Swiss-Prot record:
Disulfide bonds: none annotated. L-serine binds at T280, A281, E282, E334, S436. The keyword Protein biosynthesis applies. It comes from Rhodopseudomonas palustris (strain HaA2). Its EC number is 6.1.1.11. One of its GO terms (cellular component) is cytoplasm. Consists of two distinct domains, a catalytic core and a N-terminal extension that is involved in tRNA binding. Belongs to the class-II aminoacyl-tRNA synthetase family. Type-1 seryl-tRNA synthetase subfamily. This is Serine--tRNA ligase.
Length: 476
């Protein structure tokens, strides 16, 4: 969320940064919404002030036994009492319109972020290691996993449909080992505090980290059947104005049938009992400081969690339809930092190095890309993507994203009202950062494809062998 005062004070600078994302200037329209809001507030405050003054004048008139003036003032107060709800409603409407507009526009890129329209504008920052040489043609992880009898997409489809997998035996254990290894390094060496957060969160948590409202269709939501039906009945009843004809049994019955037939898109209805399945532990971890004022002596605060993550991937039809690259459910180790504004730049570099370190210890070749303005995430000011080499992808292998490390400035903090208090005692918004440390499922793919052997077995990286009971090779 952006500061409307900063936009008012320097609209040209705001638009200059905003248009670097390939978007049209927007400062003028935001300022107009703010002017409407401020005018509505002024009218409401003037009416309230006049009502207060008139009420006092009534007492003075009565003391002076000026009944005519007292009657006129009472009539004025009565009229103000009638008109004020409309003025207050206008304030609320204008305020919500501005907040809605601000909530739907992305963060501004830092000046150092390279300009570009899409992923082709990303810049190769640095690389680690080299591609492995094989005396055979490397296979894809799904071919290897299915041949081992440890990766079952058909069984998953029977249970849950497409984009799910059942892992068994050695590969199930290997995935667990990877997650535990990542956590141990981040907590034992990198100073992160392990958290076991909720996987189901409410609307305001998703809004705080900016998954809502823009990316609603990419998320899974859950609500009880009772609440769903009640909400639809209330929604339809209100829409049909059935309250004015409560005896209209036919109308009420229609609403009930509509709820049962699931004919209403209720995703935008007010549903306080709805939950969202987290698309990343960033949501749960970052919202731990929502509506808080932290002591800056406690910052930076570093948190990590190993959780399942859930994504509908509504915009991914036809992409990565085979294998585990793009799943509705996957496991990920998340890194979150809460910092002061002065700390966030250095913390971003530190977070990247923490994510890199676990991949280095697995002996995986990767490259780090600085995302351009047209490819960075909605809430990000600057993002590094780590792309790991997967020799079984496509023709001759491919780099695939395994981690994104982003600094968000105070963009999320404003949405969450997360602040800190420094030595001067004045509260200010914190800065938030998040990164994958890393995606466990994709790390599993990278290990399978990079450590495959000609007979189809998988060598276990040295760093993971203690987590595998000393097992060195996963074989059929």
């Amino acid at each position: 969320m952006h500061d409307i005062k900063a936009i008012r004070d320097n609209p040209q600078a705001f638009d200059a940064a905003f248009t670097r994302r390939g978007l049209a200037p927007i400062a003028d329209s935001l300022i107009k919404l703010d002017e409407t809001r401020r005018a509505a507030i002024l009218e409401s405050e003037k009416a309230q002030a006049r009502r207060n003054a008139a009420s006092k004048e009534i007492g003075d008139a009565k003391k002076a036994k000026d009944n005519a003036r007292a009657d006129a003032l009472m009539a004025e107060v009565a009229e103000l009492k009638t008109t004020m709800p409309a003025l207050e409603a206008a304030v609320k409407e204008a305020d919500e319109a501005l907040k809605k507009a601000l909530s739907e526009i992305p963060n501004l890129p830092l000046d150092e972020v390279p300009e570009g329209a899409d992923e082709h504008g990303n810049v190769d920052h640095h690389r680690f290691g080299a591609k492995r040489d094989y005396a055979f043609t490397p296979k894809a992880h799904y071919d290897l996993g299915e041949a081992l009898g440890m990766m079952d997409f058909e069984a998953a489809a029977k249970i849950s449909g497409a984009r799910f997998v059942v892992l068994k035996k050695g590969l199930a254990r290997l995935e667990r080992a990877i997650g535990q290894f990542f956590l141990d390094v981040h907590t034992g060496e990198h100073g992160y505090t392990e958290v076991n957060p909720p996987l189901l969160v409410r609307d305001d948590a998703m809004f705080g980290t900016a998954q809502l409202p823009k990316f609603r269709e990419d998320q899974f939501q859950t609500v009880t059947e009772e609440v769903r039906r009640r909400t639809i009945v209330e929604f339809v009843s209100s829409a049909m104005k059935l309250g004015a004809s409560a005896t209209d049994a036919g109308g009420s019955e229609f609403a009930r049938q509509l709820a049962n037939e699931e004919l209403v898109d209720f995703s935008y209805a007010k549903m306080p009992e709805r939950f969202w399945l987290i698309p990343t532990a960033e949501v749960s971890l970052t919202n731990l400081v929502r509506e808080s004022i932290l002591d800056e002596k406690e910052l930076p605060m570093r948190l990590t969690a190993l959780t399942p993550c859930f994504r509908a991937e509504a915009g991914a039809a036809g992409r990565d339809t085979r294998g585990m690259i793009r799943q509705h459910q996957f496991t990920k180790v998340e890194l979150v930092s809460i910092t002061t504004p002065e700390q966030s730049k250095d913390e971003h570099e530190r977070m990247l190095s923490c994510a890199e370190e676990v991949l280095r210890r697995l002996g995986l070749h990767y490259r780090v890309m600085t995302l351009c303005t047209g490819d960075m995430g909605f809430a990000s000011q600057k993002t590094y993507d780590i792309e790991v080499w997967m020799p079984g992808q496509g023709e001759g292998g491919a780099y695939r994203e395994i981690s994104s490390c982003s600094v968000c400035g105070d963009f999320q903090a404003r949405r969450m009202d997360a602040r800190s208090r420094g030595p001067d005692g004045k509260p200010r918004f914190v800065h938030t950062l998040n990164g994958s440390g890393t995606a466990v499922g994709r790390a599993l793919i990278a290990v399978i494809e990079n450590y495959q052997q000609e007979d189809g077995s998988i060598a276990v990286p040295d760093a993971l062998q203690p987590y595998m009971g000393g097992l060195k090779v996963i074989a059929k």
